[in-house]
Regions:
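An active-site-proximal structural segment forming one wall of the substrate-binding cleft
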Residues: 26-57, 120-124
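Generic structural signal for well-ordered alpha-helices
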Residues: 42-43, 82-90, 121, 125, ...
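Substrate-binding cleft/loops of secretory-pathway carbohydrate-active enzymes
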Residues: 101-137, 173
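Active-site-adjacent "subsite" loops/lids of carbohydrate-active enzymes
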Residues: 1-43
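Substrate-binding cleft of secreted/luminal carbohydrate-active enzymes
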Residues: 128-176
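Active-site mouth loops of central-metabolism enzymes
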Residues: 21-37, 106-114, 169-175
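Aromatic-lined carbohydrate-recognition surfaces of secreted/lumenal glycan-active proteins
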Residues: 1, 54-55, 76-117, 153-167
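Active-site-proximal loop/short-helix segments
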Residues: 51-80
């Protein structure tokens, strides 16, 4: 909604028009207003008692459209853009004690779409407190292994699979 209501924050195509897709508008991860707004919102959530924020869509659009970024010399990659925003959020929020996590795309990991999404699993797990992924019982082990490829990442406590169906074993509370 932000990109649609405040055009100055919108991610742009190479021609300078606002990028939109079936998800709606996307914000430019380098836009100063967007960054300031996200940090302010997170700080307010911390003051309200929240101890963690999980960003959804901390990624770039999956379309192959060429994108243009605000205030950048050169042409950063989509990964550069996502990592730069994650670093900014981590640095700006570290003093608050708020955990910074993200919901990443299983497609980015399993179908190797990270170059389009910008969600590089060799970098993001180092910047985030937790990595959350919508998973199935069939792919959860593969996702865990891919995200925890770096031995410094503790998958037991920092990998959070969101499962639509509870596994056969264990105790779970389910709805529906």
């Amino acid at each position: 909604l932000m990109a649609e209501r405040y055009a100055a924050t919108a991610q742009q195509t190479a021609s300078g028009s606002a990028y939109t897709d079936s998800s709606g508008g996307w914000v430019d991860p380098y836009n100063t207003f967007t960054r300031t707004y996200l940090v302010s919102l997170c700080k307010e959530l911390r003051e309200l008692g929240f101890d963690e924020v999980a960003f959804s869509y901390l990624q770039q659009p999956l379309a192959a459209t060429e994108l243009k970024y605000a205030s950048q010399s050169g042409t950063p990659s989509r990964t550069d853009a996502v990592v730069a925003l994650a670093k900014y959020l981590r640095t700006s929020l570290s003093a608050t004690g708020l955990r910074v996590s993200a919901i990443v795309s299983a497609d980015s990991i399993l179908q190797e779409q990270a170059k389009l999404s910008g969600q590089d699993m060799t970098v993001l797990p180092k910047l985030l407190d937790r990595v959350c992924v919508f998973a199935t019982t069939d792919n959860v082990s593969t996702l865990r292994s891919a995200i925890a490829a770096d031995s410094s990442f503790d998958a037991a406590t920092r990998f959070v699979p969101f499962l639509a169906k509870a596994p056969e074993s264990g105790s779970y509370v389910t709805t529906g």
